[in-house]
Amino acid sequence: MYLAKHFLIGAVVYAFAGTALAQRVELQPAPFVQVPFQVDGNSPVSWKDGQLQFFTSDGTPVKAHGADQFALSQPTRIVVDRSDHLPMWIESVWTDDDGTVYGWYHNEPGGVCPDGKLTAPRIGAAVSYDGGSTFYDLGLVLTSPDPADCSAKNGFFAGGHGDFSVIPDRERAYFYFLFTNYGGDVIGQGIATARMAFEDRKMPSGAVWKYFAGAWAEPGLGGRVTPVFRAETSWQRADTDSFWGPAVHFNTSLESYVVLLNRACCKPGWPQEGIYASLNPDPGNPAGWSEPVRILRDIGWGPGYYPQVIGLGPGETDTEVGEGARLYVHGRSKWELVFTKGDFFISGADQPLDPSAPMPGDRLDQTSTGRRAGR
Protein backbone atom coordinates (compact mmCIF):
# COMPACT_ATOMS: atom_id res chain seq x y z
CA MET A 1 0.00 0.00 0.00
CA TYR A 2 1.40 3.39 -0.97
CA LEU A 3 0.68 6.84 0.31
CA ALA A 4 0.59 10.17 -1.43
CA LYS A 5 -0.01 13.48 0.27
CA HIS A 6 -0.98 16.85 -1.10
CA PHE A 7 -2.33 20.09 0.26
CA LEU A 8 -5.20 22.19 -0.96
CA ILE A 9 -5.81 25.72 0.24
CA GLY A 10 -7.10 25.17 3.76
CA ALA A 11 -7.05 21.40 3.48
CA VAL A 12 -4.61 18.53 3.83
CA VAL A 13 -5.15 15.42 1.73
CA TYR A 14 -3.76 11.94 2.25
CA ALA A 15 -4.31 9.22 -0.32
CA PHE A 16 -3.86 5.52 0.38
CA ALA A 17 -3.49 3.64 -2.90
CA GLY A 18 -3.08 -0.03 -3.62
CA THR A 19 -4.28 -2.44 -6.25
CA ALA A 20 -7.84 -1.14 -5.90
CA LEU A 21 -9.09 2.43 -6.10
CA ALA A 22 -7.18 5.04 -4.14
CA GLN A 23 -8.52 5.89 -0.70
CA ARG A 24 -8.35 9.55 0.21
CA VAL A 25 -8.59 11.21 3.62
CA GLU A 26 -8.88 15.00 3.53
CA LEU A 27 -8.44 17.15 6.64
CA GLN A 28 -10.44 20.39 6.38
CA PRO A 29 -10.83 23.31 8.79
CA ALA A 30 -14.25 23.69 10.40
CA PRO A 31 -15.86 25.99 12.98
CA PHE A 32 -14.62 25.28 16.49
CA VAL A 33 -16.90 23.20 18.71
CA GLN A 34 -16.32 21.72 22.15
CA VAL A 35 -18.12 19.06 24.14
CA PRO A 36 -19.65 21.16 26.96
CA PHE A 37 -18.22 19.08 29.81
CA GLN A 38 -15.06 17.22 30.76
CA VAL A 39 -14.07 14.25 28.61
CA ASP A 40 -11.32 11.70 29.08
CA GLY A 41 -10.43 8.74 26.90
CA ASN A 42 -12.36 7.64 23.85
CA SER A 43 -15.96 8.92 24.04
CA PRO A 44 -18.30 6.56 22.16
CA VAL A 45 -21.75 7.45 20.85
CA SER A 46 -24.93 5.58 19.96
CA TRP A 47 -28.53 6.45 19.05
CA LYS A 48 -31.75 5.95 21.01
CA ASP A 49 -35.19 7.23 19.97
CA GLY A 50 -33.68 9.70 17.52
CA GLN A 51 -31.29 11.12 20.09
CA LEU A 52 -27.51 10.87 20.05
CA GLN A 53 -26.19 9.27 23.24
CA PHE A 54 -22.68 10.49 24.15
CA PHE A 55 -20.66 8.48 26.68
CA THR A 56 -17.50 9.64 28.40
CA SER A 57 -15.71 9.09 31.69
CA ASP A 58 -13.23 10.63 34.08
CA GLY A 59 -13.06 7.48 36.18
CA THR A 60 -16.83 7.67 36.63
CA PRO A 61 -18.82 7.07 33.43
CA VAL A 62 -21.44 9.62 32.38
CA LYS A 63 -23.85 10.03 29.48
CA ALA A 64 -25.30 13.04 27.67
CA HIS A 65 -27.79 13.23 24.81
CA GLY A 66 -28.91 15.59 22.10
CA ALA A 67 -30.38 15.94 18.63
CA ASP A 68 -26.84 15.62 17.28
CA GLN A 69 -23.21 15.96 18.37
CA PHE A 70 -23.50 19.76 18.40
CA ALA A 71 -26.43 19.98 20.83
CA LEU A 72 -25.51 17.86 23.84
CA SER A 73 -27.18 18.09 27.22
CA GLN A 74 -25.26 18.19 30.46
CA PRO A 75 -24.24 14.64 31.43
CA THR A 76 -25.79 12.40 34.04
CA ARG A 77 -23.92 9.75 35.96
CA ILE A 78 -24.24 6.20 34.67
CA VAL A 79 -25.27 3.65 37.29
CA VAL A 80 -23.04 0.56 37.37
CA ASP A 81 -24.34 -2.44 39.29
CA ARG A 82 -21.04 -3.19 41.06
CA SER A 83 -18.02 -1.18 42.14
CA ASP A 84 -15.13 -3.66 42.02
CA HIS A 85 -14.02 -2.42 38.59
CA LEU A 86 -14.13 1.27 39.42
CA PRO A 87 -12.67 3.62 38.38
CA MET A 88 -13.78 2.80 34.86
CA TRP A 89 -13.82 4.55 31.51
CA ILE A 90 -16.44 3.28 29.04
CA GLU A 91 -14.50 3.64 25.78
CA SER A 92 -16.63 1.68 23.31
CA VAL A 93 -20.32 0.89 22.88
CA TRP A 94 -22.38 -0.98 20.32
CA THR A 95 -26.19 -1.14 20.10
CA ASP A 96 -27.88 -4.42 19.16
CA ASP A 97 -31.00 -4.61 17.02
CA ASP A 98 -33.19 -4.98 20.12
CA GLY A 99 -31.75 -1.82 21.71
CA THR A 100 -29.38 -3.59 24.08
CA VAL A 101 -26.19 -1.56 24.50
CA TYR A 102 -22.95 -3.48 24.92
CA GLY A 103 -20.12 -1.49 26.44
CA TRP A 104 -16.45 -2.08 27.09
CA TYR A 105 -14.44 -0.28 29.75
CA HIS A 106 -10.88 0.58 30.75
CA ASN A 107 -10.28 -0.09 34.47
CA GLU A 108 -7.37 1.22 36.54
CA PRO A 109 -7.10 -0.85 39.73
CA GLY A 110 -5.50 0.48 42.88
CA GLY A 111 -2.84 -1.25 44.93
CA VAL A 112 -0.73 -2.30 41.95
CA CYS A 113 2.45 -0.63 43.23
CA PRO A 114 3.42 0.05 46.85
CA ASP A 115 3.62 3.83 46.45
CA GLY A 116 0.29 3.97 44.62
CA LYS A 117 1.67 6.10 41.79
CA LEU A 118 1.31 3.54 39.00
CA THR A 119 -1.48 1.22 37.97
CA ALA A 120 -1.89 -1.51 35.34
CA PRO A 121 -5.12 -1.15 33.36
CA ARG A 122 -7.49 -3.93 32.37
CA ILE A 123 -10.37 -4.11 29.92
CA GLY A 124 -13.85 -5.32 30.81
CA ALA A 125 -17.35 -5.62 29.35
CA ALA A 126 -20.78 -4.41 30.44
CA VAL A 127 -24.35 -4.41 29.15
CA SER A 128 -27.25 -1.96 29.37
CA TYR A 129 -30.95 -2.62 28.79
CA ASP A 130 -32.09 1.01 29.15
CA GLY A 131 -30.06 2.74 26.45
CA GLY A 132 -26.95 3.24 28.53
CA SER A 133 -28.22 4.83 31.73
CA THR A 134 -27.53 1.68 33.75
CA PHE A 135 -24.84 -0.90 33.05
CA TYR A 136 -24.35 -4.40 34.40
CA ASP A 137 -20.69 -5.37 34.68
CA LEU A 138 -19.96 -8.60 32.77
CA GLY A 139 -16.39 -8.88 34.05
CA LEU A 140 -12.89 -8.54 32.69
CA VAL A 141 -12.11 -9.71 29.16
CA LEU A 142 -8.51 -8.58 28.50
CA THR A 143 -5.67 -8.71 31.04
CA SER A 144 -1.91 -8.79 30.72
CA PRO A 145 0.24 -11.88 31.37
CA ASP A 146 3.16 -9.73 32.51
CA PRO A 147 3.87 -8.74 36.12
CA ALA A 148 3.64 -5.08 37.03
CA ASP A 149 6.92 -3.20 36.74
CA CYS A 150 6.71 -0.59 39.48
CA SER A 151 10.01 0.92 38.34
CA ALA A 152 8.42 2.06 35.05
CA LYS A 153 9.18 5.71 34.27
CA ASN A 154 6.21 6.68 32.05
CA GLY A 155 4.34 8.21 35.00
CA PHE A 156 1.07 6.28 34.70
CA PHE A 157 1.32 2.56 34.03
CA ALA A 158 3.37 -0.34 35.37
CA GLY A 159 2.01 -2.51 32.56
CA GLY A 160 -1.43 -3.76 31.61
CA HIS A 161 -3.86 -3.51 28.69
CA GLY A 162 -6.00 -0.40 28.14
CA ASP A 163 -6.80 2.67 26.02
CA PHE A 164 -8.73 0.81 23.33
CA SER A 165 -11.73 0.62 21.04
CA VAL A 166 -14.02 -2.18 19.83
CA ILE A 167 -15.87 -2.72 16.56
CA PRO A 168 -17.90 -5.56 14.99
CA ASP A 169 -17.09 -6.77 11.51
CA ARG A 170 -19.67 -6.29 8.76
CA GLU A 171 -20.71 -9.94 8.81
CA ARG A 172 -21.36 -9.87 12.56
CA ALA A 173 -19.01 -12.79 13.02
CA TYR A 174 -16.63 -11.12 15.50
CA PHE A 175 -16.06 -8.08 17.66
CA TYR A 176 -12.51 -6.82 17.22
CA PHE A 177 -10.53 -5.09 19.97
CA LEU A 178 -7.62 -2.75 19.26
CA PHE A 179 -5.86 -1.95 22.53
CA THR A 180 -2.59 -0.72 23.99
CA ASN A 181 -0.22 -3.17 25.68
CA TYR A 182 1.93 -1.29 28.18
CA GLY A 183 3.84 -4.16 29.79
CA GLY A 184 6.32 -6.96 29.26
CA ASP A 185 9.20 -6.97 26.82
CA VAL A 186 9.22 -4.09 24.35
CA ILE A 187 8.80 -6.56 21.47
CA GLY A 188 5.22 -7.16 22.68
CA GLN A 189 4.34 -3.55 23.53
CA GLY A 190 2.27 -1.19 21.40
CA ILE A 191 -1.08 -1.64 19.66
CA ALA A 192 -2.37 -5.21 19.91
CA THR A 193 -5.59 -6.87 18.77
CA ALA A 194 -8.06 -9.50 19.96
CA ARG A 195 -11.48 -10.74 18.94
CA MET A 196 -14.63 -12.31 20.35
CA ALA A 197 -17.28 -14.30 18.50
CA PHE A 198 -20.41 -12.23 17.98
CA GLU A 199 -22.59 -14.83 19.69
CA ASP A 200 -20.49 -14.56 22.88
CA ARG A 201 -21.37 -10.90 23.47
CA LYS A 202 -23.76 -11.74 26.32
CA MET A 203 -21.18 -13.82 28.21
CA PRO A 204 -17.83 -12.34 27.14
CA SER A 205 -15.50 -13.20 30.01
CA GLY A 206 -13.21 -15.98 28.81
CA ALA A 207 -14.55 -15.65 25.24
CA VAL A 208 -12.01 -13.12 23.91
CA TRP A 209 -8.92 -14.38 22.07
CA LYS A 210 -5.74 -12.41 21.43
CA TYR A 211 -3.76 -12.40 18.21
CA PHE A 212 -0.29 -13.91 18.75
CA ALA A 213 2.25 -15.40 16.33
CA GLY A 214 -0.19 -15.56 13.43
CA ALA A 215 -3.21 -17.03 15.24
CA TRP A 216 -6.16 -15.92 17.38
CA ALA A 217 -5.30 -18.53 19.98
CA GLU A 218 -4.12 -16.76 23.15
CA PRO A 219 -6.75 -16.21 25.87
CA GLY A 220 -7.90 -12.68 26.52
CA LEU A 221 -7.29 -13.19 30.22
CA GLY A 222 -3.53 -13.49 30.61
CA GLY A 223 -2.60 -14.44 27.04
CA ARG A 224 0.33 -13.15 24.99
CA VAL A 225 0.13 -10.69 22.08
CA THR A 226 1.89 -9.91 18.83
CA PRO A 227 1.47 -6.16 18.33
CA VAL A 228 0.00 -4.71 15.16
CA PHE A 229 2.13 -1.59 15.70
CA ARG A 230 5.04 -2.33 17.97
CA ALA A 231 6.47 0.23 20.39
CA GLU A 232 9.77 1.66 19.23
CA THR A 233 10.93 2.49 22.77
CA SER A 234 9.63 0.69 25.86
CA TRP A 235 6.81 2.03 28.02
CA GLN A 236 9.06 1.34 31.00
CA ARG A 237 11.22 4.29 29.94
CA ALA A 238 10.46 7.98 30.40
CA ASP A 239 11.16 8.64 26.72
CA THR A 240 8.79 6.01 25.32
CA ASP A 241 8.10 6.07 21.60
CA SER A 242 4.88 4.25 20.85
CA PHE A 243 1.42 4.53 19.38
CA TRP A 244 -1.43 4.25 21.87
CA GLY A 245 -5.18 4.79 22.32
CA PRO A 246 -6.56 3.47 19.00
CA ALA A 247 -10.00 4.75 17.92
CA VAL A 248 -11.38 2.56 15.14
CA HIS A 249 -14.37 2.98 12.83
CA PHE A 250 -15.74 1.41 9.68
CA ASN A 251 -15.87 3.90 6.85
CA THR A 252 -18.73 3.23 4.45
CA SER A 253 -17.30 5.60 1.84
CA LEU A 254 -13.90 3.89 1.76
CA GLU A 255 -15.32 0.42 2.50
CA SER A 256 -12.47 0.06 4.95
CA TYR A 257 -11.71 0.23 8.65
CA VAL A 258 -9.85 3.34 9.77
CA VAL A 259 -7.98 3.68 13.06
CA LEU A 260 -6.73 6.93 14.57
CA LEU A 261 -3.72 6.75 16.89
CA ASN A 262 -1.92 8.91 19.42
CA ARG A 263 1.86 8.79 19.38
CA ALA A 264 3.89 9.44 22.54
CA CYS A 265 7.45 10.44 21.67
CA CYS A 266 10.19 10.79 22.91
CA LYS A 267 10.40 12.77 26.16
CA PRO A 268 8.93 12.36 29.67
CA GLY A 269 5.24 13.12 30.14
CA TRP A 270 3.73 11.42 27.08
CA PRO A 271 4.12 14.39 24.72
CA GLN A 272 1.79 14.09 21.74
CA GLU A 273 3.99 13.86 18.63
CA GLY A 274 0.98 13.75 16.34
CA ILE A 275 -2.23 12.02 15.34
CA TYR A 276 -1.90 9.16 12.87
CA ALA A 277 -4.27 7.16 10.67
CA SER A 278 -4.11 3.61 9.31
CA LEU A 279 -6.52 1.68 7.05
CA ASN A 280 -7.41 -1.99 6.74
CA PRO A 281 -10.25 -3.59 4.72
CA ASP A 282 -10.31 -6.61 7.05
CA PRO A 283 -9.65 -6.44 10.81
CA GLY A 284 -9.33 -10.22 10.78
CA ASN A 285 -6.02 -9.69 8.96
CA PRO A 286 -3.77 -7.83 11.44
CA ALA A 287 -1.01 -7.59 8.82
CA GLY A 288 -3.42 -5.64 6.60
CA TRP A 289 -3.15 -2.37 8.53
CA SER A 290 -1.35 0.24 6.45
CA GLU A 291 1.71 2.01 7.77
CA PRO A 292 0.39 4.78 10.07
CA VAL A 293 0.51 8.24 8.52
CA ARG A 294 0.53 11.43 10.53
CA ILE A 295 -2.50 13.52 9.64
CA LEU A 296 -2.21 16.20 12.33
CA ARG A 297 0.68 17.63 14.32
CA ASP A 298 -0.15 21.19 15.42
CA ILE A 299 -3.31 20.55 17.41
CA GLY A 300 -3.55 23.95 19.12
CA TRP A 301 -4.07 22.78 22.70
CA GLY A 302 -2.50 20.31 25.08
CA PRO A 303 -2.02 17.59 25.83
CA GLY A 304 -3.84 16.77 22.57
CA TYR A 305 -4.80 13.18 23.35
CA TYR A 306 -7.76 11.01 22.33
CA PRO A 307 -8.46 11.61 18.64
CA GLN A 308 -11.76 10.24 17.39
CA VAL A 309 -14.37 10.89 14.74
CA ILE A 310 -18.14 11.25 14.89
CA GLY A 311 -19.92 10.89 11.56
CA LEU A 312 -21.99 13.73 10.12
CA GLY A 313 -24.54 11.56 8.32
CA PRO A 314 -27.89 10.39 9.72
CA GLY A 315 -27.45 7.68 12.34
CA GLU A 316 -23.67 7.72 12.14
CA THR A 317 -21.55 7.21 15.24
CA ASP A 318 -17.91 7.04 16.27
CA THR A 319 -17.60 3.50 14.85
CA GLU A 320 -19.59 3.86 11.60
CA VAL A 321 -18.85 6.89 9.46
CA GLY A 322 -19.56 7.89 5.87
CA GLU A 323 -17.95 10.50 3.67
CA GLY A 324 -17.78 13.23 6.32
CA ALA A 325 -16.96 13.30 10.01
CA ARG A 326 -15.91 15.70 12.72
CA LEU A 327 -12.43 15.03 14.09
CA TYR A 328 -12.30 15.55 17.86
CA VAL A 329 -9.20 15.74 20.03
CA HIS A 330 -9.91 15.57 23.77
CA GLY A 331 -13.49 16.72 23.21
CA ARG A 332 -12.68 19.68 20.95
CA SER A 333 -12.97 19.94 17.19
CA LYS A 334 -11.90 22.45 14.56
CA TRP A 335 -11.58 19.96 11.71
CA GLU A 336 -13.61 17.75 9.43
CA LEU A 337 -12.32 14.61 7.77
CA VAL A 338 -13.62 13.81 4.28
CA PHE A 339 -13.22 10.22 3.07
CA THR A 340 -13.45 9.49 -0.66
CA LYS A 341 -12.53 6.69 -3.01
CA GLY A 342 -11.56 6.86 -6.67
CA ASP A 343 -8.82 7.04 -9.27
CA PHE A 344 -7.04 10.37 -9.16
CA PHE A 345 -3.58 11.90 -9.08
CA ILE A 346 -2.38 13.74 -5.99
CA SER A 347 0.44 16.26 -5.89
CA GLY A 348 1.44 19.70 -4.61
CA ALA A 349 1.79 21.27 -1.17
CA ASP A 350 0.78 24.35 0.81
CA GLN A 351 3.32 23.71 3.58
CA PRO A 352 6.70 21.97 3.72
CA LEU A 353 6.66 18.22 3.90
CA ASP A 354 7.85 16.98 7.28
CA PRO A 355 10.98 14.83 6.83
CA SER A 356 10.13 12.84 9.95
CA ALA A 357 6.72 11.77 8.63
CA PRO A 358 6.39 8.12 7.56
CA MET A 359 7.35 7.51 3.97
CA PRO A 360 5.43 5.38 1.48
CA GLY A 361 5.74 1.73 2.38
CA ASP A 362 4.30 -1.70 1.91
CA ARG A 363 1.66 -3.20 4.13
CA LEU A 364 2.89 -4.23 7.52
CA ASP A 365 3.67 -7.87 8.10
CA GLN A 366 3.83 -9.68 11.41
CA THR A 367 7.54 -9.05 11.88
CA SER A 368 7.42 -5.36 10.99
CA THR A 369 8.41 -2.93 13.73
CA GLY A 370 5.39 -0.80 12.88
CA ARG A 371 5.86 2.47 14.76
CA ARG A 372 4.63 4.16 17.91
CA ALA A 373 1.81 4.43 20.67
CA GLY A 374 1.16 6.67 23.88
CA ARG A 375 -1.17 7.88 26.72
Kindly label every feature range from the protein language model.
Residues I9-G10, A20:
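Cleavable N-terminal signal peptides
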Residues A15-A17:
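N-terminal signal peptide c-region/cleavage motif recognized by signal peptidases
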